[in-house]
Swiss-Prot record:
Superkingdom of origin organism: Bacteria
Subunit record text: Monomer and homodimer. Part of the essential Sec protein translocation apparatus which comprises SecA, SecYEG and auxiliary proteins SecDF. Other proteins may also be involved.
Alphabetized HAMAP family for the sequence: SecA (MF_01382)
EC number: 7.4.2.8
Record protein name field: Protein translocase subunit SecA
Originating species: Fusobacterium nucleatum subsp. nucleatum (strain ATCC 25586 / DSM 15643 / BCRC 10681 / CIP 101130 / JCM 8532 / KCTC 2640 / LMG 13131 / VPI 4355)
Length: 869
C-alpha cells in the first residue's frame, strides 16, 4: 500500500527514466531545423567529425544528441522515415545497455539505427541479432542504405556463408545475424590452429531483436559442435543381450539397508541379478549379478579398469530395460525412429535424443537401427555467450513479465517505452468450453462470421498440428485462408504482411511471423515486389503507387469493421506469448480486438484448476456449446501461467549454475589457447610444462620421508616411457635433495630437447610444438566435456545424500579440470620427446604424377596443391 502511494506521488522508476530521456529528445528535436539545412556532403561528414572527437577524448554520451539528430535526418533523406520521439527514447535505452519494450508496429528496426550508428563510431563493431536468417538479411538490406550514406559498412552472417565472407562481415562496422551463427562462430574460432582462421573480432556491443525469444525461450538449449565418436554400436547390442538374460531382484530391493540384508542371510535363490530404485531412478548390480555377467562375457573382473566403458554400456542397457517404457517415455515410429515423449505435455519431441548413450541403448532394446553416438567438441549456453559482450541490450514487444529473469541472468533492466499513439484495441474476456469439440465448433463459427463480415482475422494456435486441424475444417466450409508455420521464414513474412487485408483469414502458430508488421489493408511494398523483381526496377515506383492507393482504400474498409481480430485457440504456458499474439493487433493507434477460446481439455486447463471451473459449469447447468466467462477464470489461468513460468525459470537458472562452472574452465582453456596462437615460439612454454611435470612426478615418487623408501625404479621407468630418458648414475638420487634431483633431470631433458631441435631444425621444431600442443589440448578438452556430461548425469543422485548437486559438481569438476591440465602438460611434452619425423627427401616424380592425383608425400592432398606447387 505504501509503495502504491509513493508511486502516485513520485511516479514509477520507469516513468522517471522516460521523463529524463524526454529532456534529451528535446535537445535532438532542437537540432532538427539546423540539420535539415545541411547538404548531403555536410551531413555525411558528420561521421568523420564524430570519429575525430572520440579520438580526442570525448565519449559516446558526449556526442549522443548530435549523432541521433544526424541519423534521424539521414533516415528522412534515404529511407523516407522520420524517427518518432518515442523511437529516439527507445534508442537511448538500447545505448545504455538495457532492454526496451516497445509494442508491435512501433518500428523497432528503425529504433536500433541510432544506437547502432553511435556505437559503431568507436570502431569496435556492433552486432545486431535477429531470430532467423530471413530477418537478418532483410534488416541489413534495408538499413545498409542508411549506414552506407553515413559512411559505415555493414555485413550479414548467414548459414552456410564461406569463411572469407564471414570474416569480411565481422570486420564491418555493423554485423547482422542470428544468435546461433554468432555463437557457433565463437566456438569454431576457439578450435582453429592459426589466428588468420578466426572470423570474429572482440564482442563489443550487441542489440538483440526479439530479446525474450532469444535470451529466454532458446536459453535452455546450449550450442553444441559435435563430431562422430568411435563406433560402438556392437557394444550396445551385446550389452542389451546380456541384460536380457538377467533377472531383477524384487525381493531384496524392498530392504533398503545393506547391513540388514547381510544379517538376514537371504537365500541365494531370492537374490536377483540387479536391484532397481525407481524413485531415484538408479539400478545396481548384486554380487550374484556381477558374477553372472562375468560368466556370460567370459571375463575375470567386471570392475577392472579396462572394463569401465563396458560397465557404462551395461548400466545404460539396464536403464533402457527397466526405467524407460515404450509409449510412456518414448515411441517408435514405423521407420524405426525412437522419439522421446515430453513428460509434461505428452508430445513427441522431434529431433531430441537422450544423452550419454541411453538413446542407443533404447534403440538396441527395440531392435531398430542404432544411430552412431556423437562426441561434443565444443559447447556454450546462450546465456554465457551473450554475457561476454562488453555491452548488451535488446528490444521486444513483451519483456516486462520476464524482467526478474533478465536482471538475474544478464543484469539487464527493462524499460517500457510509451506507444507513439494510444492503444485502443479491445481485449475480451476468455471463453471457456467444457470440451475441445465444443470449442473448435465455436471457433469455426466465429471465423466464418468474421469472414462473411469482411473483418480480417488472425487465428493463433500453439502447435502446427492444431493449425492443420483448423485448416481442414475451414476447407470444408469453403473459407479461403492461409496457414503459417515457422518453416519458411521468407514466405511467412509475405503472408503475415497481408493478414490485415479485407476478408483475410490467417492461421499461425503463436511464434510465427514475428518481425513483420500486419498493416491494415495490406502492405503495398510486398504486393509491388510480387509483381516486379526489386526496388531498383524502373517500374517499381509506378507499381508501388498503384498498390499504395489500393491498400489505402482497403484500410478504410477494415477500420470501419473494427480492425484486425485476434482469435487465440488456446492459452500458452507463458503470458508473454499470449501478449505477443494480442500485440499483432492495434498497431499505431489502429482499432482491433482479441479473444481467447479455451476448453477444460486444453493442457493448461487440464493441469491447473479445471476442477473448479467444472464445478461452476455444473452449477450453472450450461447447455452444450455454451461457454463461461468470468474474471475468476482469467485470474486462475494467470496463476497457472505464473507457476509454469517460475518452473521454467528454475530450469534455466539451474542450467546456468552448472554451465557457469564449465564456463570458467572454458574461458581459461580458450584464453591460454589464444595466447599460444599469438606466439610464434612456444619453446619456453613447453619447457615450463616439462619442469612442472617433472617436479610433480619426483614429489610423487619421492613422497616418503625416508630416502631408502623413495621409488627410484618407478621414476626411472616413467622417465624412460615418457621422455626416452635413462639415468646413467643410479646412485645420484642418494646424493641429492629432491630439488637438486629435479634440476638434474630437467637440465638433462632440456639438453636432450635441444639436441632434437638441432637435428630437426628450429623451424620444424616450432611447428611441431604448436601442432602437438593444440592437438593435445583439443583432445583432452573434448574428453573433459564428456566427463562433465557424465558427471552431470550422475550428480543428482548426491542430492539424496543431503548434498547439494551444484556444490558437488563444482568440487568434482574442479578436480577433473586439474587432472586434465596435468595430463595436457604430460602428454604434450612426452609426444615432443618421442616424435619421429621422416626427413628423407621425396623423389622427384613430377613427370609421372597426374596434376589431380594424390601427392606421394602421404599428406592425402592433391599433388598440385602440395609438393607440386
Amino acid at each position: 500500500m505504501i509503495g502504491s502511494l509513493l508511486k502516485k506521488i513520485f511516479g514509477t522508476k520507469n516513468d522517471r527514466e522516460i521523463k529524463a530521456l524526454t529532456k534529451e529528445v528535446e535537445k535532438i528535436n532542437a537540432l532538427e531545423s539546423e540539420y535539415e539545412k545541411l547538404s548531403d556532403e555536410d551531413l555525411k561528414n558528420k561521421t568523420n567529425i564524430f570519429k575525430e572527437r572520440l579520438k580526442n577524448g570525448e565519449t559516446l554520451d558526449d556526442i549522443l544528441v548530435e549523432a541521433f539528430a544526424t541519423v534521424r535526418e539521414a533516415s528522412k533523406r534515404v529511407l523516407g522515415l522520420r524517427h518518432y520521439d518515442v523511437q529516439l527514447i527507445g534508442g537511448m535505452v538500447l545505448h545504455q545497455g538495457k532492454i526496451t519494450e516497445m509494442k508491435t508496429g512501433e518500428g523497432k528496426t528503425l529504433v536500433a539505427t541510432c544506437p547502432v550508428y553511435l556505437n559503431a563510431l568507436a570502431g569496435h563493431g556492433v552486432h545486431v541479432i535477429t531470430v532467423n536468417d530471413y530477418l537478418a538479411k532483410r534488416d541489413r538490406d534495408q538499413m545498409s542504405r542508411l549506414y552506407g550514406f553515413l559512411g559505415l559498412s555493414s555485413g550479414v552472417i548467414l548459414n552456410g556463408l564461406p569463411t572469407d565472407q564471414r570474416k569480411k562481415s565481422y570486420n564491418s562496422d555493423i554485423t547482422y545475424g542470428t544468435n546461433s551463427e554468432f555463437g557457433f562462430d565463437y566456438l569454431r574460432d576457439n578450435m582453429v590452429s592459426s589466428l588468420d582462421q578466426k572470423v570474429q573480432r572482440e564482442l563489443n556491443f550487441c542489440i538483440v531483436d526479439e530479446v525474450d525469444s532469444i535470451l529466454i525461450d532458446e536459453a535452455r538449449t546450449p550450442l553444441i559442435i559435435s563430431g562422430a565418436a568411435e563406433d560402438k554400436i556392437k557394444w550396445y547390442q551385446i550389452s542389451f543381450q546380456v541384460v536380457s538374460m538377467l533377472n531383477r531382484s524384487y525381493e531384496t530391493e524392498k530392504i533398503k539397508n545393506i547391513k540388514e540384508k547381510k544379517a538376514m542371510n537371504i537365500p541365494d535363490e531370492k537374490w536377483g541379478d540387479y536391484e532397481v530404485d525407481e524413485k531415484s531412478r538408479v539400478i545396481v548390480f548384486t554380487e550374484k549379478g556381477v558374477k553372472r555377467v562375468e560368466e556370460i562375457l567370459k571375463i575375470d573382473n567386471l570392475y577392472a579398469p579396462e572394463y569401465v566403458e563396458l560397465t557404462h554400456f551395461l548400466n545404460q542397457a539396464l536403464k533402457a530395460k527397466e526405467l524407460f517404457k515404450r509409449d510412456r517415455d518414448y515411441l517408435v515410429r514405423d521407420n524405426g525412429e525412437v522419439v522421446i515423449i515430453d513428460e509434461f505435455t505428452g508430445r513427441a519431441m522431434e529431433g531430441r535424443r537422450y544423452s550419454d548413450g541411453l538413446h542407443q541403448a533404447i534403440e538396441a532394446k527395440e531392435g531398430v537401427k542404432i544411430a552412431s553416438e556423437n562426441q561434443t567438441l565444443a559447447t556454450i549456453t546462450l546465456q554465457n555467450y551473450f554475457r561476454m559482450y562488453k555491452k548488451l541490450s535488446g528490444m521486444t514487444g513483451t519483456a516486462e513479465t520476464e524482467a526478474t529473469e533478465f536482471m538475474h541472468t544478464y543484469g539487464l533492466e527493462v524499460v517500457v517505452i510509451p506507444t507513439n499513439l494510444p492503444v485502443i484495441r479491445k481485449d475480451d474476456a476468455d471463453l471457456v468450453y467444457k470440451t475441445k469439440k465444443e470449442k473448435i465448433n465455436s471457433i469455426i463459427d466465429r471465423i466464418q462470421g468474421l469472414y462473411e463480415k469482411g473483418q480480417p482475422v488472425l487465428v493463433g494456435t500453439i502447435s502446427i498440428k492444431s493449425s492443420e486441424e483448423l485448416s481442414e475444417l475451414l476447407k470444408k466450409r469453403k473459407i479461403p485462408h492461409n496457414v503459417l508455420n515457422a518453416k519458411y521464414h521468407a514466405k511467412e513474412a509475405e503472408i503475415v504482411a497481408q493478414a490485415g487485408r479485407y476478408k483475410a483469414v490467417t492461421i499461425a502458430t503463436n511464434m510465427a511471423g514475428r518481425g513483420t508488421d500486419i498493416m491494415l489493408g495490406g502492405n503495398p511494398e510486398f504486393m509491388a515486389l510480387a509483381e516486379v523483381d526489386s526496388r531498383d526496377d524502373e517500374n517499381f515506383p509506378e507499381v508501388f503507387a498503384k498498390y499504395q492507393e489500393q491498400c489505402a482504400n482497403e484500410k478504410e474498409q477494415v477500420l470501419a469493421l473494427g480492425g484486425l481480430f485476434i482469435l487465440g485457440t488456446e492459452r500458452h504456458e507463458s503470458r508473454r506469448i499470449d501478449n505477443q499474439l494480442r500485440g499483432r493487433s492495434g498497431r499505431q493507434g489502429d482499432p482491433g480486438e482479441s479473444e481467447f477460446y479455451l476448453s477444460l481439455e486444453d493442457d493448461l486447463m487440464r493441469l491447473f484448476g479445471s476442477e473448479r471451473v467444472m464445478i461452476w459449469m455444473d452449477r450453472l447447468k450450461l447447455p452444450e456449446g455454451e461457454p463461461i466467462t468470468h474474471r475468476m477464470i482469467n485470474s486462475a489461468i494467470e496463476k497457472a501461467q505464473k507457476k509454469i513460468e517460475a518452473r521454467n525459470f528454475g530450469i534455466r537458472k539451474n542450467l546456468l549454475e552448472f554451465d557457469d562452472v564449465m564456463n570458467k574452465q572454458r574461458t581459461a582453456i580458450y584464453e591460454s589457447r589464444n595466447e599460444a596462437l599469438a606466439i610464434d615460439n612456444l619453446k619456453d612454454r613447453i619447457l615450463g610444462m616439462l619442469q612442472r611435470n617433472i617436479t610433480e612426478k619426483v614429489y610423487e615418487k619421492f613422497a616418503p620421508e625416508m630416502r631408502e623408501d623413495w621409488d627410484i625404479d618407478g621414476l626411472n621407468e616413467y622417465l624412460k616411457d615418457f621422455y626416452v630418458y635413462e639415468e646413467r648414475d643410479d646412485k645420484a638420487y642418494l646424493r641429492s635433495t629432491k630439488e637438486e634431483y629435479i634440476e638434474r633431470i630437467y637440465n638433462a631433458l632440456v639438453e636432450q630437447y635441444n639436441n632434437k631441435e638441432a637435428e630437426l631444425g628450429s623451424d620444424l621444431m616450432r611447428k611441431l610444438e604448436k601442432h602437438i600442443l593444440f592437438d593435445v589440448v583439443d583432445n583432452r578438452w573434448r574428453g573433459h566435456l564428456k566427463s562433465l556430461d557424465a558427471l552431470r548425469e550422475s550428480i543428482y543422485l548426491r542430492a539424496y545424500g543431503q548434498r547439494d548437486p551444484v556444490t558437488e559438481y563444482k568440487l568434482i569438476s574442479s578436480q577433473i579440470f586439474e587432472e586434465m591440465i596435468a595430463t595436457i602438460q604430460e602428454q604434450a611434452t612426452s609426444f615432443l620427446f618421442k616424435v619421429v619425423v621422416n626427413t628423407e627427401p621425396v623423389k622427384d616424380e613430377k613427370n609421372e604424377i597426374e596434376a589431380d592425383g594424390l601427392c606421394p608425400c602421404g599428406s592425402g592432398k592433391p599433388y598440385e596443391k602440395c609438393c607440386g606447387r
